[in-house]
């Protein structure tokens, strides 16, 4: 905490998670994640998570830490994994890779607008194209999708009153 000082969590809470493919020590990753989740919870910050072949361990850590809000960045999981995350009130963010995978496209289609984000990450595809393709996949007008994602952003990142992951006062 002393290292962060008055700077806050900045990028610490934005890019945390688990990657069980790249060979980094799993115990070290879990330890770092626990620290980051604790700090985010103490400061009331949402967490944006990177998850590569570590869905179950990551879900266990989230259950133990109960962060204010959770967004799975670059989600490329199965529809079942999406259902598990969505049932906890977490949000899913999809990008260009979504459209190359039938299972991830099914996960996008099953994600409620109130729990959806879109991203480019490091893709050269413009965000406008990702919005257009996602709107088509979900069968909604692009303007409806844009408004829903803007509402999600405001709810999670601009200081609303939260009552658990992905929920604000008044949500049912």
List PLM regions with ranges.
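Single conserved hydrophobic/aromatic residue that forms the stacking wall/gate
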Residues: 1-13
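Short, structured coil segments at secondary-structure junctions
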Residues: 8, 88, 111-112
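Divalent metal-binding pocket/active-site signature
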Residues: 11-88, 99, 106, 139-143
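Mid-to-C-terminal alpha-helical segments outside catalytic/metal-binding sites
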Residues: 39, 131-172
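Thr-Gly-centered strand-to-loop micro-motif
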Residues: 49, 72, 93-96, 118-120
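Short, acidic/turn-prone active-site loops that include or flank metal/cofactor-
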Residues: 75-76, 96-100, 121-124
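Short, motif-level signal for alpha-helix interfacial/capping segments enriched in acidic residues
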Residues: 96-112
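Short acidic/histidine-rich active-site segments
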Residues: 114-126
């Amino acid at each position: 905490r002393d290292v962060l000082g008055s700077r806050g969590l900045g990028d610490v809470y934005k890019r945390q998670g688990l990657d069980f493919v790249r060979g980094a020590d799993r115990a070290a990753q879990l330890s770092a994640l626990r620290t980051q989740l604790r700090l985010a919870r103490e400061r009331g910050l949402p967490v944006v998570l990177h998850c590569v072949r570590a869905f179950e361990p990551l879900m266990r850590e989230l259950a133990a830490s109960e962060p204010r809000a959770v967004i799975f960045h670059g989600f490329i999981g199965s529809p079942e994994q999406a259902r598990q995350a969505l049932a906890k009130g977490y949000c899913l963010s999809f990008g260009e890779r979504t459209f190359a995978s039938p299972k991830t496209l099914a996960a996008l289609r099953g994600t409620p607008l109130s729990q959806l984000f879109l991203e480019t990450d490091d893709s050269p595809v413009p965000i406008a194209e990702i919005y257009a393709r996602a709107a088509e996949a979900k069968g909604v007008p692009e303007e409806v999708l844009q408004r829903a994602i803007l509402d999600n952003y405001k709810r999670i990142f601009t200081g609303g009153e939260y009552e658990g992951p992905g929920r604000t006062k008044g949500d049912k």
